[in-house]
Structure formats: structure tokens, C-alpha cells
Amino acid sequence: FVNDEPAGTTNTVETYVDGLTPGKRNLVRFVCGERELSVGVTTPAEPFTINVRDCGAKGDAEHDDTTNIQAAIMACPKGGRVLIPAGSYRIKSLFLKSNINIELAEGAVLLARHDRAALAYIPGTVTGNEGAGYAGTDMLPLGRWEGESFSTYCSTFTGLGVHDVCIYGRGAIDGQTDFAEDNWWNKDFKNIFRPEEGREVSRPRMIFLSECENVSLAGFTVRNSPAWNIHPILCEHVDALCLSIEGPKNSHNTDGFDPESCGFVRILGCQFSVGDDCIAVKSGKLGIDPELRPATHDVLISHCYMHDGHGAVVLGSEAAGGIKDLTVSKCLFERTDRGLRVKTRRGRGKDAVNEGITFEHIRMDEVLTPFVVNSFYFCDKDGKTDYVQSREALPVDDRTPGFGATTFCDIEATNCHAAAAYITGLPESKVTRLTFQDVHVTFADDAEPFVPAMACGVEPMVRQGIIAQNVKVLDLQNVVIEGQDGEELQLQNVDKVIRA
């Protein structure tokens, strides 16, 4: 109930509630049987609302409404609201500005155009005066593609250096991507733009943010993205709240939410069903200037539901700046290929270290391999070279990544297929410490073989226990694996095993 008026029902902990009155204290009540929780919420004042229909937008799925909606955004004063009411709005790219709210009302759908000739693009990096750029450099980071500075088609929403922005509502953003010969997921269409074939401009995202601060995304649905759905880079204080991010299982590179070199990120109460990783936390590749790939840090992922995808929550592989202080808690994974997945490889660099990583209170069902740590990830054009894939200990240099302590606590995985855990560190840079505490894994009766990690030489397997290679300390506290074929532990070059 909002101010004693019925506002709907929910079966989730993180819940999107609307209908609050701006500029006053609102009473929100949750009632479950005889139990009741009341919360007072004081909302900021909203001086003006600009309806995009008053700027000429038609919402008829035929007229191009880009300039009409952009006009409403530019006209909106500080603290105001841009209202996109119910309707289907064909658009190219919209650019955000600071200190505004954008409401995608229930029934409002932004339909992204996919014809390249209609889309603007931004360069990867622009060089300017000394000290005028990001972090005191002379560089202005704009476009990025898979961890590298790269010219990029503008996204449905593009935010460059904006702050205090909220996009919210029960509407949707639809990339309208499919496998037609002139659309982004078509293999031949996509291959024209591969880097090794001279691609100059990368695919757009649905929401792309660079150097932004205090951005909230709440309530709406994002679907059918040309590539990664939501991609913030070099941002701080970004919230993704109660979003639904969707794409077919066979769609290409459609990661759900990929924070890259960001700090203080919260992903709460979101649902994911995509063709790639649901959430992939990144921090760039080694080739980017170090100032433009700081560590991603202080990330909280909680009460999210991941169903279908390559990995539910993934670290890397483009994480040359490192990932620090990340917690994944109270989430449900279903039918993903892998559950908690860490990807790295030689060539990511000495700063590519994960530290302070905790996965806790997680339930998985029909996840093929619940835990994967892969230090031989073979994507990228050099991913299958001897340097990346050699299982021999190579000299440690500035290209060698590291792996700090990681904890997996209170996790239950049922109906698994391939292995309980597949862990491979580098022989010259072992995984420092992996702690599994209160972990229970069972296998499906009809389990089928599957390749647990994307690395050369890894064969399909079925009902295997914990496979661990090149680890300093493997700490197993109350770990139960049931239904595996063969040994529960298959260890190679593991310095110390603790069991309790």
C-alpha cells in the first residue's frame, strides 16, 4: 500500500514500488497475513514534468521520435521529470543530461533502430590538453568494446559525464535485434565488423554510461540488445534495481549488466535471462592506459534471479585493473552453464588481481558447473596461442595476472551436470586461497557431459567432483558432494588442503 492505496503484490525481497507523491513524506506498507511493515519515504520535490508527447513524440511505432524525446530531455530543468507515457517509440540514440529523472511509464516501449546508417557513433578516446581529461590525464574516454578503447555506435541511452540521473518505470527498452541478414545477431552481418577484418565501429548497447556518477536504473525491462545490455565504465555510485534483462539463449554477446572500472555499484532484485553472462564484472584490458582501467571495487549483487546464460555472476576476463571488494549474496541461479565464474589468462597484467571476493547464501538448480575458476580463458584472437594456453610455468612478468583469496559460503547446488567445481590457476601464479564453507552439491539423474571451462584441452565431463590445479590453499569446510563418479577431489599442484 502507498499512502493507504493498494499498490500491488510481490513475492520478492527487493520490490519496485511506484505511485509515491513527489516532495512529501509517503507511507509505504507491506502486509503479509498478520504481519505488517511500514516505511516512511520522503521523496524529493519535482518542479516540472515534461511529457514527450508535448514535444511532438507520437509513440505510434512508425514515426521516428528521437529528436522529440531528446528535446524533452534537453528542456527538462534540474530535478524535473521527463515522462514517456504508454506507446511504442521508434528511436535511434538518446543522450542523457545531469539532474533529471526519466520515467518509462507502464506500456511505454522504446524501439531501437538497428540500421547502421541511421546511428551516430563516438570515438574510443579523444586526446586534449594536458590534465584536462579523466583522472588528470589528457584523455577523454568515450567508446569501449570488450575492454579496449574503440569507436562505438551510440546506445539507446548514452550518458557521458552526467550525474544525478534516474531512469525508472514499468516500461521497456527493446533493441529489436534478431538474426535477420541485416541485423546485429546475424553471424555474417556481425563478422563484417570483426576487428581482424577491419571493423571500425562496434555494436551499440542498450544503456552505455561513461564517467557518470549517481545513476539509478529501476523497474523497467531491457530486451534484445545488439550486444551487452547495460555497460557502465569509469562510473561511481550506480544502482540497478528491480530490472528485468532479457535475450534469447542463442543471442551473441548479450551480457546483462557489465560494470567496468566502476566503484560503488549495487545490483539488487534484478532478473536475467540472456545469451551470454548475466553479470560480468570487468576492468579493461592491458592495452588501455592504466589511468583508464582502474579496479572495479565495492560491488554488491543481492537478491537477483539468473535463469539461462553462460555464467550467472562472472569476474573477467577483461579485468586488467583488478576487482576488489565484491559480494554476491542471496541470489538464485537456474539453468546457467556456470554459476560463479572467474575468467582470466596470461596477458591481463600484474594488476589483474581479484581481492576481497565473497559469494554467499546462494541457491542453484540445473547449473551445469556451479564453480569455475579458469586461468586459461581462450577468447580473443590470441586466446589459443601457446603463450596463453601453455600448462608449463612461464616467467612471471608485467603480463602475468594474479588471484587473491575468494570465499564461497552457504551455497547449495542441485541437479548439476559436469563438475562440482573446476579450478585452474596458473602454475607460475597460483590461486592464493579458495575457501568453500557449507557447500552442498548434488548431480542430476540425467546429467549429460559438458565442457566446464572455455580453455584448450578441456574435454566434456559428467558428474565429476572438485577438480583443482595450481592452488596454494584449498580450504573445504563442511563441503558435501553427492552423486559424483569417481573421486570427490582431483588435485594437481595444490600446496595445502584443509578439510573440516
Regions found by a protein language model. Name each.
Residues F1-A500:
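Extracellular/periplasmic carbohydrate-active domains that bind, remodel
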